[in-house]
UniProtKB/Swiss-Prot annotation:
Topology relative to the membrane: Multi-pass membrane protein
Keyword vocabulary terms for this entry: ATP synthesis, CF(0), Chloroplast, Hydrogen ion transport, Ion transport, Membrane, Plastid, Thylakoid, Transmembrane, Transmembrane helix, Transport
Annotated compartments: Plastid, Chloroplast thylakoid membrane
One Pfam family per UniProt: ATP-synt_A
S-adenosyl-L-methionine among keywords: no
Its job: Key component of the proton channel; it plays a direct role in the translocation of protons across the membrane.
Taxonomic path: Eukaryota, Viridiplantae, Chlorophyta, core chlorophytes, Chlorophyceae
Subunit structure, as described in the record: F-type ATPases have 2 components, CF(1) - the catalytic core - and CF(0) - the membrane proton channel. CF(1) has five subunits: alpha(3), beta(3), gamma(1), delta(1), epsilon(1). CF(0) has four main subunits: a, b, b' and c.
Protein's name according to its UniProt entry: ATP synthase subunit a, chloroplastic
InterPro entries named in the record: ATP_syn_F0_a_bact/chloroplast, ATP_synth_F0_asu, ATP_synth_F0_asu_AS, F0_ATP_A_sf
Organism: Stigeoclonium helveticum
GO cellular component, one term: proton-transporting ATP synthase complex
Main location: plastid
GO-annotated molecular function: proton-transporting ATP synthase activity, rotational mechanism
Gene for this chain: atpI
Family stated for the protein in its record: Belongs to the ATPase A chain family.
Length: 246
């Protein structure tokens, strides 16, 4: 037991303590958390909730304005879920995939468009929630839990037969594939958003007037692509777990 702790558990704790830059720490129930991430995450959640309330407070048979935009986004998310998960199962996963897509999109755009770094805090600096590895890992783990839940809910313990298909010797590869999915999801999103904000920050410091604007517009585009990729992969993983293998 002691050997297991030294070999596996302790290294995991060391990895979890790795961070990029300085952070504004809060202590909650004896645990230190990144306060700046909570602040920007609450801002993003508040923005999304406020938009939803305003856009849908007075629904009309013929949508217009914000209601029309809200319905377009909902239809887009529904089509995305239908394409990735499949016609039989997609409806129950529209809320999850939609929440993931909207949260990641608004978080990314907040980093590309808002001057977070101009707001002073006691330590560290504000940035997009997806600029922090803890946020992207949490989203990736939620996705992993969801596709395991989807597969077990539909197939029961028979879901785990997929690890020995089409041949038993593929078991290690199939297990490794499942554990690599959250890693690839989290590090792809974190790396792209961090790199984008660093590039914009450097250009603003060097040439603060015109040059950063095209880069910021490019950041808006790539941020949307990253949100779409994350939501698409989440839907694809769920669809893969519920599909019937013959």
């Amino acid at each position: 037991m002691l050997n297991l702790q030294n070999v596996i558990i302790n290294p995991l704790f060391e990895i979890s303590e790795v961070s990029v830059g300085e952070h504004y720490y809060w202590e909650i129930a004896g645990y230190e958390v990144h306060g700046q991430v909570l602040l920007t995450s609450w801002f993003v959640l508040g923005t999304v909730i406020l938009f939803g309330l305003i856009a849908n407070k007075d629904l009309k048979p013929l949508p217009e304005g914000l209601q029309n935009f809200s319905e377009l986004v909902t239809e887009f998310i529904r089509d995305l879920a239908k394409t990735q998960v499949g016609e039989e199962e997609y409806l129950k996963w529209v809320p999850f995939i939609g929440t993931i897509f909207i949260f990641v999109l608004v978080s990314n755009w907040s980093g590309a468009l808002l001057p977070w770094r101009l707001i002073e805090i006691p330590n560290g600096e504000l940035a997009a929630p997806t600029n922090d590895i803890n946020t992207t890992v949490a989203l990736a783990l939620l996705t992993s839990i969801s596709y395991f839940y989807a597969g077990i809910r539909k197939k029961g313990l028979g879901y785990f037969k997929r690890y020995v298909q089409p041949a038993v010797f593929l078991l290690p590869i199939n297990v490794l594939e499942d554990f690599s999915k959250p890693l690839s999801l989290s590090f792809r999103l974190f790396g792209n958003i961090l790199a984008d904000e660093l590039v914009v920050g450097v250009l603003v410091a060097l040439v603060p007037l015109i040059v950063p604007i095209p880069v910021m517009l490019l950041g808006v585009f790539t941020s949307a692509i990253q949100a779409l990729v994350f939501a698409t992969l989440a839907g694809a993983y769920i669809g893969e777990s519920v599909e019937d293998h013959h």
